[in-house]
A protein has these predicted regions:
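Conserved alpha-helical scaffold flanking the Walker A/P-loop in AAA+ ATPase domains
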Residues: 24-28, 81-101, 130
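C-terminal engagement/docking regions of AAA+ P-loop ATPases
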Residues: 231-311
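Walker B catalytic acidic pair
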Residues: 40, 103-104, 115
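AAA+/P-loop NTPase substrate/partner-engagement loops
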Residues: 56-84
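Walker A/P-loop
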Residues: 30-67
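Pre-Walker A (pre-P-loop) alpha-helix and adjacent loop at the N terminus of AAA/AAA+ ATPase modules
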Residues: 2-44
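P-loop (Walker A) phosphate-binding loop of NTP-binding proteins
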Residues: 41, 75, 143
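Canonical AAA+ ATPase core
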Residues: 82-85, 108, 112, 120-212, ...
Length: 311
């Protein structure tokens, strides 16, 4: 594993206890220039995770706590008239940062959700006819409460598709919970976190991730998996071409963290559930049976032959 990557993980895991796998997946998503949706109950460390990543990676960060009265201009900014200059001046919103923590994104209106998610896809915002590019890198770590919680608005599938991966933090195990209590007993662990890389060094790691090689056998495997989701009897809407591209990007990051400059089929299989579960729309029968997308994807992985790469 790259030494810088190892140092990043070590520093983050000193705060985010017992969640090493999720920490690695979030770092992969950042290296793949993707956005992360963390879905879980309150109090399991979603916000702390986002703040820790921002600090360790040397990124500017801002936070939006979404509520029912959050409006699009809070996120993307607005124009105000400057009398002295006799012109309108752009006042940036929270989105003009490197890492945006979008807290409880499903508690706000569809209009505000759309403003954020369009900017996530296009990496720019348009206000009063003027277009403004977002900073580089730009990553959104969004949190949402489980569907059905009071005051939540379901994200449409087209908007869920903008997130590279969806994760659930889950409750810590017994030992990790004790460590969390011990760490927070006398101080906030975030106070002792130090930046491990600069913004420019992070961008170099992003470029190295992009340079990871993948061949036609890998592309064929990804395509076959995506097609299998579209024809599965329990799936109404499967993985889109954008989802297949996301799978390749995340697999490159998985290979990079594994110390390789090329993708193997195991990279695809490892990230398949996290990249694709939130992109599936299950059939009425599947929903009635309370079937889970993750179980369907596991079944598809078993049914599709993994290619053997030639040396």
């Amino acid at each position: 594993m790259n030494k810088k990557i190892q140092n990043i993980l070590t520093e983050i895991e000193s705060v985010i206890v017992g969640k090493n796998e999720n920490v690695e997946k979030i770092l992969m998503a950042i290296l793949a220039q993707g956005h992360v949706l963390m879905e879980d109950v309150p109090g399991v460390g979603k916000t702390t995770t986002a703040l820790t990543f921002a600090k360790v990676l040397g990124l500017d960060t801002r936070r939006v706590q979404f509520t029912s009265d959050t409006v699009p201009s809070d996120v993307i900014g607005y124009s105000v008239y400057d009398k002295s200059a006799d012109s309108f001046v752009y006042k940036p919103g929270a989105i003009m940062t490197n890492l945006l923590l979008a807290d409880e994104i499903n508690r706000t209106s569809s209009k505000t959700q759309s403003a954020l998610l369009e900017a996530m896809e296009e990496h720019r915002v348009t206000v009063d006819g003027q277009t403004y590019d977002l900073p580089t890198p730009f990553v959104v770590l969004a949190t949402q409460n489980p569907t059905g919680s009071a005051g939540t608005t379901l994200l449409p599938s087209s908007q869920l598709d903008r997130f590279l991966i969806r994760l659930s933090m889950g409750y810590p195990d017994h030992k990790s919970q004790i460590n969390i209590l011990r760490d927070h007993h006398s101080e906030n662990p975030l106070d002792r976190v130090q930046p491990v890389v600069t913004k420019d060094e992070l961008l170099e790691l992003v470029q190295e991730t992009r340079n990871v090689e993948a061949n036609d056998r890998i592309f064929d495997y990804v395509t076959t998996l995506a097609e299998a989701t579209r024809t599965h009897p329990m799936v109404e809407l499967g993985v889109s071409p954008r989802g297949a591209l996301a799978l390749c990007r995340m697999a490159k990051a998985h290979a990079f963290l594994s110390g390789r400059d090329f993708v193997v089929p195991e990279d695809i299989a490892a990230v398949f559930p996290d990249v694709c579960a939130h992109r599936l729309i299950l059939s009425a029968k599947a929903r009635m049976m309370e079937e889970k997308a993750e179980n369907i994807l596991a079944e598809i992985l078993k049914s599709v032959d993994m290619p053997v790469l030639k040396a």
